[in-house]
């Protein structure tokens, strides 16, 4: 972003924010706080998400009475390509496990690409995750607190270049912590909308 910073500063539709709290979770929290619109889309910058799905998200959340539109790469009508095999197997196992624990049929909690009403994201705060596990925390809080959401099939295309910062060995404990935290919040604290 440093190289593109001057370019984006000149554009009316872009704001460059200096994030004091490092990490992906800090960046997402800052983006939510500073978002100017009613809706917030979270997506990765690696071009793996389909922009046609973004248009569909926006239409659905604006026309329906939804707090969130949750995409799934693993529904009839979804297209997935170039997903690393080991990562895919772990993804499917973990998401199935989460579905069992939370007694919910949603099957793609860990996918980043979703759209939310900004006020809903503010209401479920604080978001405590500091890394990729924030993508698990947000939909778990949405679902556990009984917000209104819709699940739709989306497309995903593997990264064409560069390397992912997602490291399974490093993030496993963070995902487990988030899962336990959200489970306790749902079952012991009984926090609702």
Please provide the spans of the model-predicted regions.
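Acceptor/aglycone-binding surface of glycosyltransferases and processive sugar-polymer synthases
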Residues: 19-22, 26-34, 39-42, 51-132, ...
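Terminal low-complexity segments of carbohydrate-biosynthetic enzymes
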Residues: 63, 177-193
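Acidic donor-binding segment of Leloir-type glycosyltransferases
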Residues: 1-17
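Short, well-ordered coil/turn elements that cap or connect secondary structure elements
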Residues: 9-12, 63, 144
């Amino acid at each position: 972003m440093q190289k593109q910073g001057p370019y984006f500063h000149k554009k009316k539709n872009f704001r460059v924010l200096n994030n004091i709290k490092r990490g992906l979770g800090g960046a997402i929290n800052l983006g939510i706080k500073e978002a100017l619109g009613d809706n917030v889309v979270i997506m990765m910058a690696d071009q793996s998400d389909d922009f046609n799905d973004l248009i569909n998200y926006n239409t659905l959340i604006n026309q329906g009475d939804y707090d969130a539109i949750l995409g799934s790469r693993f529904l009839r009508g979804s297209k997935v390509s170039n997903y690393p095999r080991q990562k895919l197997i772990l993804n499917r196992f973990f998401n199935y496990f989460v579905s069992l624990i939370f007694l919910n049929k949603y099957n793609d909690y860990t996918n980043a690409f979703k759209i939310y009403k900004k006020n809903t994201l503010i209401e479920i705060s604080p978001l405590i995750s500091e890394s990729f596990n924030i993508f698990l925390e947000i939909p778990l809080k949405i679902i556990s607190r009984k917000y209104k959401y819709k699940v739709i099939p989306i497309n995903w295309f593997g990264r064409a270049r560069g390397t992912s910062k997602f490291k399974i060995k490093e993030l496993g404990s963070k995902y487990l912590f988030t899962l336990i935290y959200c489970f306790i919040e749902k079952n012991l604290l009984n926090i609702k909308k």
